[in-house]
Curated annotation (Swiss-Prot):
This is Nucleoside diphosphate kinase. The active site is at 115 (pros-phosphohistidine intermediate). PROSITE patterns: NDPK (PS00469), NDPK_LIKE (PS51374). Its cofactor is Mg(2+). GO terms for cellular component: cytoplasm. It is found in: Cytoplasm. ATP binds at residues 9, 57, 85, 91, 102, 112. Its EC number is 2.7.4.6. Major role in the synthesis of nucleoside triphosphates other than ATP. The ATP gamma phosphate is transferred to the NDP beta phosphate via a ping-pong mechanism, using a phosphorylated active-site intermediate.
Length: 141
């Protein structure tokens, strides 16, 4: 059973879209194996997005991710990484498929509602960044 990391970003948390987004995941068959709401520090956001450190949007991304609380989740299910990415839609909400999370709730490339792991390898890294193994409940459903 695959696991992937999902983050509901500050824009969606601030607009009270948490429940709607979780419902999309659950209706697709993904299950929540771990979840918490946190307000990232600068150090945490920089550490999480370190792969983008040399990119021109890095500081803007960090500033956005620390602008309010986020909901961090481990989603579990068959093909969890790919399913989550399909549910999220394209990074740019204007290009995201109709009905996708980013089409429904995203505003721009930078303010795009959710983050999701882009590969199984990165999912493992990202999950361990936020959760200890003891915090993850393997679902039986």
């Amino acid at each position: 059973m695959e696991q992937t990391l999902s983050i509901i970003k500050p824009d969606s948390v601030g607009k009270a879209h948490i429940g709607e987004i979780i419902a999309i995941f659950e209706k697709s068959g993904l299950r929540i194996a771990a979840m918490k709401m946190v307000h990232l520090s600068v150090k945490e956001a920089e550490g999480f997005y370190v792969v983008h450190k040399e990119r021109p949007f890095f500081q803007e991304l960090v500033d956005f991710m620390i602008s309010g609380p986020v909901v961090v989740m481990v989603l579990q299910g068959e093909n969890a990484v790919d399913r989550n990415r399909e549910l999220m839609g394209a990074t740019n909400p204007k290009e995201a498929a109709e009905g996708s999370i980013r089409a429904l709730f995203g505003e721009s490339i930078g303010v795009n509602a959710v983050h999701g792991s882009d590969s199984l390898e990165n999912a493992a890294i990202e999950v361990s960044y936020f959760f200890a193994k003891t915090e993850i409940v393997n679902s039986v459903a």
